[in-house]
């Protein structure tokens, strides 16, 4: 299930584009997540009151959280699968405090792929999409394993 060196290079190359505007990309990812899967919004007390896409686009808190999400994910991706130290506290908080089901990690992975496709079509062709999908699946599988260790079956 691991990625080849070439696949990791594709992932990290496109991630460099994301890092040029983490907050903007993160905001778009969260907006897409909430639009495609409105039930996910219920997990975010801070954002439950945001009903329209315009309200979401105008929310500094949403932009800040998008930055936080993609910053954490970037730190994990840069470890090229050797992300145990980064993953453990993330899994702990998402399982015990926030109670985010693994299914929602799939939903946000889809949103990330969609945002990258729309914002970076020239840098996110089929090979890069395949590599990113594999990297995000590895992340989700490892999060799910940590959840299980913590006794969370979300």
UniProtKB/Swiss-Prot annotation:
SUPFAM superfamilies: Globin-like. Its main location: cytoplasm. Heme b binds at residue 94. Residues 2-148 form the Globin domain. It is found in: Cytoplasm, Sarcoplasm. Keywords: Cytoplasm, Heme, Iron, Metal-binding, Muscle protein, Oxidoreductase, Oxygen transport, Phosphoprotein, Transport. The modification Phosphoserine is found at residue 4. It catalyses: Fe(III)-heme b-[protein] + nitric oxide + H2O = Fe(II)-heme b-[protein] + nitrite + 2 H(+); H2O2 + AH2 = A + 2 H2O. The modification Phosphothreonine is found at residue 68. O2 binds at residue 65. Nitrite binds at residue 65. CDD domains: Mb (cd08926). Its EC number is 1.7.-.-, 1.11.1.-. One of its GO terms (biological process) is removal of superoxide radicals. GO terms for cellular component: extracellular exosome; sarcoplasm. Monomeric. This is Myoglobin. It comes from Ochotona curzoniae (Black-lipped pika). The gene is MB.
């Amino acid at each position: 299930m691991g990625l080849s060196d070439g696949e990791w290079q594709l992932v990290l190359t496109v991630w460099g584009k994301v890092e040029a505007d983490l907050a903007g990309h993160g905001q778009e990812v969260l907006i897409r997540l909430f639009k495609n899967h409105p039930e996910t919004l219920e997990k975010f007390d801070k954002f439950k009151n945001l009903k329209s896409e315009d309200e979401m686009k105008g929310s500094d808190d949403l932009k800040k959280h998008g930055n936080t999400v993609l910053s954490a994910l970037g730190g994990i991706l840069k470890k090229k699968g050797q992300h145990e130290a980064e993953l453990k506290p993330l899994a702990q908080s998402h399982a015990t405090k926030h109670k985010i089901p693994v299914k929602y990690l799939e939903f946000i992975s889809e949103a990330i792929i969609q945002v990258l496709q729309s914002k970076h079509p020239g840098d996110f062709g089929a090979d890069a999409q395949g590599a990113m999908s594999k990297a995000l699946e590895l992340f989700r599988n490892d999060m799910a394993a940590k959840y299980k260790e913590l006794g969370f079956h979300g």
